[in-house]
């Protein structure tokens, strides 16, 4: 668990209908306040039914699901080779990057608990779902086997004096 920093993963995505790889974070207080009140930072979501497209999202009590804090980005070569997916998370803003290119910034003026639950510790999750409400429901079984290849995951934080 940690609060604030630069978080990145260098990964090669699996491709095909029904696949749903993700690199994301949840508020460490999820057991106390439940989702979405704990906050969620989706650094990367890819769904095989939408080629060349990635999603970055923030989920809060005020904004969860496919809302204003979900950014859908077309990247022509996202299915080839390795790519760097990262987020810069500070007390003021959350910035999302793909291959060091800024694709979305969330910097609300009003930081109530409903809008900004991002001032507490979070933890990382990386997973590959098959099907599901976002990745499916149809799965093309002919695509298997597939791999979600992770080169590295890094978290950088400023030192406190």
Predicted regions and their residues:
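GH16 jelly-roll
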Residues: 1-161
